[in-house]
Amino acid sequence: METSILSGLEASKALYSSLESRISHLKDRGIVPGLAAVLVGNNPASEIYVKNKTKKFESLGLKTDVFRLEESVSEDKLLSLISKLNTDSEFHGILVQLPLPKHIDSEKVLNAIIPTKDVDGFHPENAGLLSIGKPRFV
């Protein structure tokens, strides 16, 4: 078997070209895809990651909102926000930036995101689809 080097830049360009076309078709139908990014606390690495994601989304003409919560937010309040975002038609995807504070059950929070809005693919349904070669988003 021959080894080859994958060009991340070339793969990225091809992916974004495909995305631009798909986004254009959605916008023609009056749909502007939206991402809700949830950031708890002020972890510098998480801040950079979310900033880069939202910048890329915005460059594609997509709607992005970052929901910033204090490090001390209760799990119930975070779950309430997830529940609200699950039913908000402006957002087609939800990203909860990890790590979460120790007093919050990350698994419980990630499982609260409805599978069709789980952009990270952490929900058991999405992980299962990926494991059988039928990924929802990847």
For the regions a protein language model found, what residue spans apply to each?
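Anion-binding alpha/beta catalytic cores of soluble intermediary-metabolism enzymes, centered on
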Residues: 95-138
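Positively charged, low-complexity intrinsically disordered leader regions
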Residues: 1-29
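Glycine-rich phosphate/diphosphate-binding loop of Rossmann-like nucleotide-binding domains
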Residues: 40-55, 133-138
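Non-catalytic terminal and connector segments of soluble metabolic enzymes
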Residues: 4, 59, 84-86, 113-117
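Short beta-strand elements in bilobed, periplasmic/extracellular small-molecule ligand-binding domains
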Residues: 35, 57-72
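Short, well-structured alpha-helical segments in soluble
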Residues: 77-89
